[in-house]
């Protein structure tokens, strides 16, 4: 398949909004590795989950909040951020995390990733305020009550819009599949067929799994991993072009920072095209499609807006996409892991950042393919593609 994305040396143009927000960026304070009290002079940052916390380099993260219209008090109340409900994630790191009720934001504990974010704060903020798929850190803070570090970030898989909360009436507006993809043997699925998959990892200390075929949950998990590795995603030419320009730009940035082991998270919704038109596209009195679609993902500008839509084989597909878990330097621990896993299934996740980033670009350039079907009018002009504009 011929590549339709931007060349690896090109970068997507900066939006006017990015230029305005980043004025005076070089005059911001020097990056500090110390947390600063929320009552510091000039600070307008609120509590998190009803607790006073101390913030890291908030002059920078204010720019992220401004760029992406994230309210300063987005997780201020206990109702939105209930610390008692925070629990370990199912990922290998197992860092504790909590979704807000609308699933638009995540509060996540930072363990070994904390010093990495401190080291790249300035570069990260400048990059993410452009056109990027990197997860947006709105706050980086220290929780005094348990002496741990956290971030507040956006979720690339938000819950349904308020008008689609009725799951029976709008069952199509649910994620049918969720993928966590690295371009290596670690590719996996978290949701398949609309059902959450139990993450049954095969570890050397799980003797029953090592010495037997394992239970049904393990088989389902393994089969889903194989599918995640082999499946393709179909997009129309323009949709694929704007997606790949971001993936390439982000991979270049992460390589430059010496980061690796990150993932592309992909949430997929789908339904027959006739159902989509009838239930999700809104028309005026003349029958012209005005707006509508599945619940929104990223809404900041035409080049940023999500989901990415395509029509293929009579189905409408909506893709919600972002890059997560990128705060990993290729340190001594990763180098040791590389040699320990040298006999493991290839390709490996623990490789040098230059290798990882190049492979990441190439893998998704092949995985996101151009559908042969024509782009529908509701996606090209006058339809849902024009709903969201910078401003």
Report the location of each language-model feature.
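Polybasic, positively charged surfaces/segments
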Residues: 1-391
């Amino acid at each position: 398949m011929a590549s339709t994305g931007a060349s690896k040396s090109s970068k997507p143009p900066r939006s006017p909004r990015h230029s305005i927000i980043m004025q005076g960026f070089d005059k911001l304070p020097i990056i500090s590795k110390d947390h600063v009290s929320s009552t510091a002079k000039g600070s307008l940052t609120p509590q998190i989950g009803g607790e006073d916390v101390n913030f890291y380099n908030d002059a920078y993260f204010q720019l992220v909040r401004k760029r992406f219209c994230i309210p300063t008090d987005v997780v201020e109340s206990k109702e939105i951020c209930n610390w008692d409900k925070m629990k370990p994630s199912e990922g290998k790191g197992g860092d504790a995390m909590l979704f807000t009720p609308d699933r638009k934001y995540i509060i996540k504990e930072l363990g070994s990733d904390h010093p990495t974010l401190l080291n790249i704060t300035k570069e990260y903020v400048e990059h993410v305020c452009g056109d990027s798929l990197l997860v947006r850190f709105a706050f980086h803070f220290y929780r005094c009550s348990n002496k741990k570090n956290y971030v507040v970030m956006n979720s690339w898989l938000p819950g349904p819009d308020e008008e689609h909360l009725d799951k029976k009436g709008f069952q199509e507006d649910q994620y049918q599949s969720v993928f966590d993809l690295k371009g290596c043997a670690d590719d996996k699925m978290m949701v398949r067929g609309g059902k959450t998959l139990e993450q049954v990892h095969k570890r050397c200390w799980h003797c029953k799994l090592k010495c037997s075929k394992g239970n049904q949950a393990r088989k389902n998990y393994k089969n889903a991993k194989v599918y995640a590795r082999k499946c393709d995603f179909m997009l129309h030419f323009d949709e694929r072009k704007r997606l790949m320009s971001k993936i390439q730009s982000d991979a270049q940035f992460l390589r430059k920072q010496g980061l690796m082991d990150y993932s592309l998270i992909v949430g997929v919704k789908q339904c027959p095209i006739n159902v989509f038109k009838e239930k999700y596209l809104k028309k005026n009195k003349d029958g012209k499609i005005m707006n509508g679609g599945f619940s929104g993902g990223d809404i900041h500008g035409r080049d940023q807006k999500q989901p990415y839509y395509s029509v293929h084989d009579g189905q409408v597909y909506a893709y919600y996409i972002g890059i997560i878990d990128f705060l990993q330097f290729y340190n001594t621990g990763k180098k040791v892991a590389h040699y320990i896993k040298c006999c493991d299934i290839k390709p490996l996740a623990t490789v040098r950042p230059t290798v990882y980033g190049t492979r990441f670009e190439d893998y998704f350039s092949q995985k996101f393919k151009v559908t042969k079907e024509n782009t529908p009018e509701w996606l090209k002009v006058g339809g849902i593609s024009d709903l969201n504009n910078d401003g």
